[in-house]
Regions:
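Short runs within selected transmembrane alpha-helices of multi-pass transporters and secretion channels
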Residues: 75, 143-162, 170-178, 199-214, ...
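Transmembrane alpha-helix boundary and packing residues in multipass membrane permease domains
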Residues: 26, 30, 42, 80, ...
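Helix-terminus/linker motif at the lipid-water interface of multi-pass membrane proteins
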Residues: 31, 35-54, 124-131, 187-194, ...
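Small-residue hotspots at the loop-to-helix junctions and early N-terminal turns
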Residues: 48-62, 137, 141, 200, ...
Length: 450
């Protein structure tokens, strides 16, 4: 019961303190998640070569991000539903939502494994992946999709734990699997000389372990969110609720990734050095995105539980606190990444041309990252209340569609990496303004609390 009281402080305690208590484990988790993700890139970049670096960090990375991003969006639907029922102390519906979420993860994992393996090579060719990179990219993705079901189970399980206020145990899982992934990367690639195959095998093995650990935590808990294998099944009403919130979030992620894939196609036309630098940039600035995402997860859970408890004024106040913390964190990250860009890129590769391209890209884009903070936090807050359709439309129109339009107009008239990169701050600025207007119009906070 003591543990339950601690979790329920999200709806009762001092806002800034409870946000930080929930947020910090996620921040540390993002750190280990990024080490986990970048270990593959560092190992192939330094011990295999720039073709392998481009294979793991280029088109293959965009395709895997597209698939996983959609499912993470869907899992956020389950997290919102569970957090609202948990805040309302509705034990029966927490259980129904949890078991429906796991049934969906298993079914989706099987489907994506089959489809992913079949469509990998056509997708790589469609993206105009450089010829010297296609084969390694296909090998990496075939193995990656082979372990997709474990990836989805872990992401769903971790989302559920965070939804009920437990951000610590997902962190512990990330630490274990991060260390394991690095050890296996070095063993398979450096010791056994397995190249891209070794990197993919290390990633999948680590995902299997992470899925088993998260499932074990949910199976052994004595709380109302206990997982029972025999009860894993679809509940039609719960599935509808999860998909109502999850599909718009998933489509939002897909549109982000589609726009990034279109950008990758334009980058692929600029040569292997630029492709390798762009892929490395994606690994480096993922640190920033994952920290902001940690704030967004925090505010989604915080808003969701308080929404379920009927504490609307507390929700709005928590958004202001979270936005302030996010901006401070963003400033610190941007300063470090800007100042130490050459050294950071040298960790990934010794190729001077790749490093030079990468440093230019980072320093061009970093100042505009503040704008995205507004989108991330307001989107997370709105998602916690179940308002997902309009934010999805704003994101798809303001960020994704505008970005693609920019590439096929300005990108054609003024070809080059600077024009490609400019699509980010332009689309973010317009979308941020739209989110601010919608937030002040529709976000609960002026209603009388229960």
């Amino acid at each position: 019961m003591e543990k339950k009281e601690k979790v329920n402080q999200i709806t009762e305690g001092v806002i800034w303190k409870q946000l930080l208590l929930f947020f910090f484990p996620i921040v540390f988790g993002t750190f280990f998640q990024q080490i986990y993700n970048t270990a593959d890139t560092i190992v192939v970049g330094r011990f295999v070569g720039k073709q392998a670096l481009a294979a793991v960090g280029g088109s293959a990375s965009q395709i895997s991000n597209l698939i996983v991003g959609f499912f993470v969006g869907l899992s956020s639907g389950a997290a919102v539903v569970i957090s609202q029922f948990y805040g309302a102390k509705d034990k029966k519906n927490v259980s129904k939502a949890l078991h429906t979420a796991f049934a969906f993860s298993i079914a989706a994992g099987i489907f994506l494994t089959v489809v992913g393996i079949l469509l990998t090579r056509p997708a790589l060719l469609l993206m105009k992946t450089p010829a010297d990179v296609v084969e390694d990219s296909a090998i990496y993705l075939h193995i990656y999709f082979g372990g997709m079901i474990f990836n989805l189970i872990y992401n769903m399980g971790a989302s559920i734990l965070r939804a009920v206020g437990d951000s610590k145990r997902p962190l512990y899982v990330l630490i274990v699997t991060c260390v394991l992934n690095i050890i296996l990367d070095l063993l398979f690639v450096v010791a056994f000389g397995m190249g891209v195959t070794g990197v993919a095998a290390a990633t999948v093995t680590s995902q299997v372990i992470s899925a088993l650990l998260v499932m074990g935590m949910l199976l052994k808990t004595e709380e109302i969110y206990v997982l029972k294998l025999r009860e894993i099944r679809f509940d039609q009403r719960m599935l509808s609720s999860v998909l109502r919130i999850g599909i718009p979030a998933g489509l939002e992620s897909v549109m982000y990734n589609i726009s990034n894939i279109v950008i990758q196609v334009f980058v692929n036309n600029l040569g292997t050095d630029t492709v390798a630098a762009w892929g490395t940039l994606g690994k480096i600035d993922a640190i920033f995105w994952m920290v902001i995402n940690a704030f967004a997860i925090s505010i989604t859970t915080f808003v969701g539980q308080n929404y379920g408890a009927g504490k609307y004024h507390r929700m709005r106040k928590s958004v202001r606190v979270c936005m302030t913390m996010s901006m401070v964190g963003a400033a610190a990250l941007i300063a470090v990444m800007y100042a130490f860009a050459p050294w950071i890129y040298s960790l990934f590769t010794t190729d001077s041309a790749v490093i030079a391209h990468g440093v230019h890209m980072s320093r061009y884009l970093l100042p505009s990252y503040f704008i995205y903070v507004i989108i991330g936090i307001l989107s997370g807050a709105l998602r916690g209340t179940g308002k997902v359709l309009v934010p999805m439309i704003l994101t798809c129109g303001g960020v994704c569609s505008l970005r693609i339009l920019w590439l096929f107009t300005a990108g054609q008239m003024y070809p080059g990496i600077n024009t490609i990169m400019l699509s980010y701050p332009v689309s973010w600025s317009i979308t941020a303004v739209l989110f601010i207007v919608y937030y002040f119009m529709k976000f609960p906070g002026k209603k009388k609390e229960n």
